Amino acid sequence: MTEAVIVDAIRTAAGRKKGMLIQTHPVDILAPILKELVNRSGVDANEVDDVVTGCVTMTSEQGGNIGRMAVLAAGFPVEVPAYSLNRMCGSSQQAIHNAAQTILAGDADITIACGVENMSRVSMGSDMGSFSSELVDRFNIVPQGFSAEMIAEKWALSREELDELSLESHRRAAESADNGDFEREILPINVKKENGEETFYQDEGIRRTTSMDKLASLTPSFQPDGGVVTAGNSSQVSDGAAGLLLMSREKAMQLGVKPRARIIARAVVGEDPVLMLTGVIPATRKVLKKAGLNLEQIDAIEINEAFASVVKAWERELNPDMSKVNARGGAIALGHPLGASGAKLTTTLLHRLEDKNGKYGLQVMCIGFGMATATIIERL
């Protein structure tokens, strides 16, 4: 039976809002990832059957099928096709699923799954207009931050709990950066600056000097009177790209390329679009069932820290060993470049599994309007 295996996984560092990547076109953030995936694996780009790209705000510089634009900018043969997809925050995780499914179906031997978002240049929501009247008649659609507040209220989560999770995210991220834990997964890229070019290789969002006092001083972003969700316990506006090279196990053996992991289960769920962000709970249960595993068997977990309340509600329901969860920090510290985040987290998950000699890794991500994606990989 055909298996979809991960041969390589890399990402750029995550740029902060209007930071190092502000002058870099999103295509030029993704193209180096594509080049490096084929160059360092020794794969001939001609053999890539398809490139699947996740991107959320597909307008302006990110419109026009950005995946195809990046393939051409990377110098791939024109015969290499690409398409772009939007499952909101789960976009590049869905790209991984689609790329794997194409291999499992026998339609491809080699695929690339990737994602990109330059939120500094293409603002979140700039691709949206008004909601349909039939939609709003059925559902009281609210901004995600209000959903995060609803989650905090439903699970009786205190401001202190959310800020503690945020502080720990920054602490873990800083420690991991200092220990060189991200060096294998981050591809340094040259970026345009006013005085020429600079090499960008470090995540910009880590706040080493934050504290509970500093976090407590922030005004709630969505409910100023009594709310608990702040900029400090929410993910950051970020820029970046990430990508994975996938093959059938047979093709990897034929090319003499060592597979690093195999994708053993994939899941996507729908959930209440008003509460919106709680799909991570049923998605985790669904993907574990598909894999025939329980949470105790998972060695490393990446859950997107869109909001601290999402992670805390998930923790309350599933009771995971939190030392395994976002062990190198999460999106509160490391950023959430929307369409790139799924591939970014899978990249971190794979490297974490390798570094700790773990076997199974779980990735799960909440998605706007009430969805979630989940993936389980097995290190080989």
Task: List PLM regions with ranges.
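Conserved catalytic cysteine-centered active-site region
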Residues: 55-108, 139-146, 209-236, 317-344, ...
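Active-site pocket-lining segment
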Residues: 185, 193, 264-333
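Active-site-proximal alpha-helical scaffold in enzymes
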Residues: 87-116, 152-182, 243-250, 337-358, ...
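N-terminal extracellular/periplasmic Venus flytrap/periplasmic-binding protein-like
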Residues: 10-12, 22-23, 29-32, 40, ...
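Conserved beta-ketoacyl condensing-enzyme motif
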Residues: 22-111, 116-132, 186-201, 274, ...
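Short, well-ordered amphipathic alpha-helical segments that serve as non-catalytic structural scaffolds
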Residues: 26-41, 66-70, 95, 144-151, ...
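Condensing-enzyme catalytic core mediating Claisen C-C bond formation in acyl metabolism
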Residues: 1-24, 212-278, 282, 289, ...
